[in-house]
Amino acid sequence: MKTLYSLRRYFHVETLFNSTLVVGGRDQESTGFAWWAGNARLINLSGKLLGAHVAHAGLIVFWAGAMNLFEVAHFVPEKPMYEQGLILLPHLAALGYGVGPGGEVLDTFPYFVSGVLHLISSAVLGFGGVYHSLIGPETLEESYPFFGYLWKDKNKMTTILGIHLVLLGIGAWLLVWKAMYFGGVYDTWAPGGGDVRVISYPTYDPSVIFGYLLKSPFGGDGWIISVDNMEDVIGGHIWIGTTLIIGGFFHIFTKPFAWARRAFVWSGEAYLSYSLASVSLMAFIAAVFVWFNNTVYPSEFFGPTGPEASQAQAFTFLVRDQRLGANIASAQGPTGLGKYLMRSPTGEIIFGGETMRFWDMRAPWVEPLRGPNGLDLSKLKNDIQPWQERRSAEYMTHAPLGSLNSVGGVATEINSTNFVNPRSWLATSHYVLGFFFFVGHLWHAGRARAAAAGFEKGIDRDTEPVLSMRPLD
């Protein structure tokens, strides 16, 4: 009678049309997974799984190196980075490599070196991946017990977690050392329009650093995305780096507490689901960060934020019309509100027109023109610098309006080329990928919990009444 219904009731993988198909010596019968399930076939083969992960890392680093060199080869120094579809060079520039005052690219050689180093690293990782996939031991527990593990070994799992946390902490400290001792980083707030600057006095005050975490994520509060100076950015990395390292050693030298042993599912698929959730959360934060923040993501490299481009337009026409004789303080727009300047709900002098909605936007090119009560009328009449005019005019025509697939954009280029601001690419892609990773988390978390409960292969139907009923035909 059991042959009357599909074996899929009992097995959570599809049955192959050709059950003799064997890929890499891992058939469905011996692993419970078909060839397209990929690394799932290697769940209990730590040596082969190591090979898969090292090879995967090699592919990632190869892409980084190859794309890096591709961007270097196509880079035009006379044009802003955000006009050239670049997504890697802006990050290197923000770290202070190859740039000078105003974000001008002075030397592309550091970018070339970065690409070559990534390619060399990818070759080493690729060799290691092939070796461990084809030649190395299938399992590591016997030959290399330090690198071996069992998914249900809770102490070993938290030790591995601790090692990862220490490595992440070292990564955070690498940025700190670069900013403080190895040439500095690019600071968009440096006087005169931004420059590479050594961060000599990072913020150590925990009330400031953790104050960001306690802020509301809504409206003008902005949670950690509201950080607006490099001292706080580097100070935050000191705190998070130190916390990660301390937490890492804690997990290395301790065993999980009883409540943790009870609360978590301890299996390979459960750890995968936890990781996917973490990456998803980071992707969502990154999407909002790159969309709104112009300190960590300087507009000189990533293009203006939406509010910044809007305010830049108001500023550009204020400058133009003031030169033509307009009285910027008293001129009225079609609605009776100030055409160039008006007051915010709390009394500050702000730009007028539609950009009033972005009245609390902060950007390096406009902050020098503010006084104790918003924009300073005297400074607007007498102290506007040429670099501020040039930058606002550039930002006005490069708003982040395009979509992920380049539809839309701003038709400000000749030859019908629509511009897509890198912030559009980075924010949209991270949001979409963050969503996919979250769905992956739900999928694998559900499977892991079902497996822990003992019914991942379907509920036992031996006692169902339908089994004793007459067949339909």
Curated annotation (Swiss-Prot):
Protein name stated in the entry: Photosystem II CP43 reaction center protein
Protein role: One of the components of the core complex of photosystem II (PSII). It binds chlorophyll and helps catalyze the primary light-induced photochemical processes of PSII. PSII is a light-driven water:plastoquinone oxidoreductase, using light energy to abstract electrons from H(2)O, generating O(2) and a proton gradient subsequently used for ATP formation.
Phosphothreonine: residues bearing it: 15
Record text on subunit structure and interactions: PSII is composed of 1 copy each of membrane proteins PsbA, PsbB, PsbC, PsbD, PsbE, PsbF, PsbH, PsbI, PsbJ, PsbK, PsbL, PsbM, PsbT, PsbX, PsbY, PsbZ, Psb30/Ycf12, at least 3 peripheral proteins of the oxygen-evolving complex and a large number of cofactors. It forms dimeric complexes.
Keywords: Acetylation, Chlorophyll, Chloroplast, Chromophore, Manganese, Membrane, Metal-binding, Phosphoprotein, Photosynthesis, Photosystem II, Plastid, Thylakoid, Transmembrane, Transmembrane helix
Family: Belongs to the PsbB/PsbC family. PsbC subfamily.
InterPro entries, alphabetized: PS_antenna-like, PS_II_antenna-like_sf, PSII_PsbC, PSII_PsbC_sf
Bilayer topology annotation: Multi-pass membrane protein
GO terms classed as biological process: photosynthetic electron transport in photosystem II
An annotated Gene Ontology molecular function: electron transporter, transferring electrons within the cyclic electron transport pathway of photosynthesis activity
SUPFAM superfamilies xrefs: Photosystem II antenna protein-like
Pfam families xref list: PSII
Binding site for [CaMn4O5] cluster: 367
Signal peptide limits: none
Cofactor remark from the record: Binds multiple chlorophylls and provides some of the ligands for the Ca-4Mn-5O cluster of the oxygen-evolving complex. It may also provide a ligand for a Cl- that is required for oxygen evolution. PSII binds additional chlorophylls, carotenoids and specific lipids.
Main location class: plastid
Lineage top rank: taxon: Eukaryota
